[in-house]
């Protein structure tokens, strides 16, 4: 499995710009639009195919920001950036080529210009590493014919993430998946997102450690943990700072971790 992971930097037209808190839908539109520019067939296939699309992306971040009270957006300054990851070369090639072909980008009414696309290095090891979300993790299950959001306080959360990883492993490798996977939640913060007009999703910003089969964990790192990765959920980075901190405390003690931590840059 090849990891194709990119940091995409954009320069705003204005010194100060808005970024709505519910913005994954706009990034999804950008990704599909640029893929369509260079590979219309692939764009149609991704639109029509059900199940995991085998790519994920982060929230849109800024080098500096302010949070005006009572508004549905924050104010960004300097550069904006986001991360994109896939294991499918055709998807990576189409999206990145499309960005360079049309470097002027309009998102939620703000204009940006492509400044840099940087290929990121792959961590050497995954099992035992600490991860932090770059976009929140979404997990759902069906009960009585309805789908419900599942939280890390429920046992099903962990089993569903493992089964989701195994399904993606089969899609990518075409072979029986390993079953060895555990995750230890260090900190968590719930977030409710409007993924499309009138459609909401409860998801979780997490700091967690993952243990088990390195290749199975690698699947989550490459194409996302949990569900709805192609809608902007489940992207993580390895948190280098926490590698040096062994006794951080229990899940319950860490529920109020700094929500800005997930917006730091990294691999």
Curated annotation (Swiss-Prot):
The active site is at residues 32, 47. Gene3D superfamilies: 3.30.70.1890, 3.30.70.1900. It comes from the Archaea. The record marks 53 as: Transition state stabilizer. Keywords: Antiviral defense, Endonuclease, Hydrolase, Nuclease, RNA-binding. Its EC number is 3.1.-.-. Signal peptide: none annotated. Pfam families: Cas6_I-A, Cas_Cas6_C. NCBIfam families: cas_cas6. CRISPR (clustered regularly interspaced short palindromic repeat), is an adaptive immune system that provides protection against mobile genetic elements (viruses, transposable elements and conjugative plasmids). CRISPR clusters contain sequences complementary to antecedent mobile elements and target invading nucleic acids. CRISPR clusters are transcribed and processed into CRISPR RNA (crRNA). This protein processes pre-crRNA into individual crRNA units. Belongs to the CRISPR-associated protein Cas6/Cse3/CasE family. This is CRISPR-associated endoribonuclease Cas6. The lineage of its organism: Archaea, Methanobacteriati, Methanobacteriota, Thermococci, Thermococcales.
